[in-house]
């Protein structure tokens, strides 16, 4: 199942542990505008999405964002939260210790 553009923006932001304000500051997209994009009230134009995806933290999600495909061998991955469903905000393993 494919996520909407707004869901993908939220997944990328949360996977990078960024607040909406931090993403706005990082990309230059005004906070209110970003809020509209994330809520699905408005769709970001291509130039805005290009700007977001060219930000160093997000280039690794470009293939996934555009095609729903990944290529880990080329550094193209999906956000971690995408693997657990669009309504989840934590991994089922988030409470476990590693090592």
UniProtKB/Swiss-Prot annotation:
GO MF terms held by the record: DNA binding
Gene: C
Annotated keywords: DNA-binding, Repressor, Transcription, Transcription regulation
Superkingdom per UniProt: Viruses
InterPro entries: Cro/C1-type_HTH (IPR001387), Lambda_DNA-bd_dom_sf (IPR010982)
Any matching Pfam family: HTH_3
Name of this protein: Repressor protein C
Residues in the DNA-binding region annotation: 20-39
Species the sequence originates in: Escherichia phage P2
CDD domains for the chain: HTH_XRE (cd00093)
Boundaries of every HTH cro/C1-type domain copy: 9-63
SMART domains: HTH_XRE
């Amino acid at each position: 199942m494919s996520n909407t553009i707004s869901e993908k923006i939220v997944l990328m932001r949360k996977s990078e542990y960024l607040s909406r304000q931090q993403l706005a500051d990082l990309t230059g997209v005004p906070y209110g505008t970003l809020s509209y994009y994330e809520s699905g009230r408005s769709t970001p134009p291509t130039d805005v999405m290009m700007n977001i995806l060219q930000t160093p933290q997000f280039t690794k999600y470009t293939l996934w964002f555009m095609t729903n495909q990944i290529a880990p061998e080329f550094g193209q991955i999906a956000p971690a939260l995408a693997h657990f469903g669009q309504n989840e905000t934590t991994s089922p393993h988030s409470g476990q210790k590693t090592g």
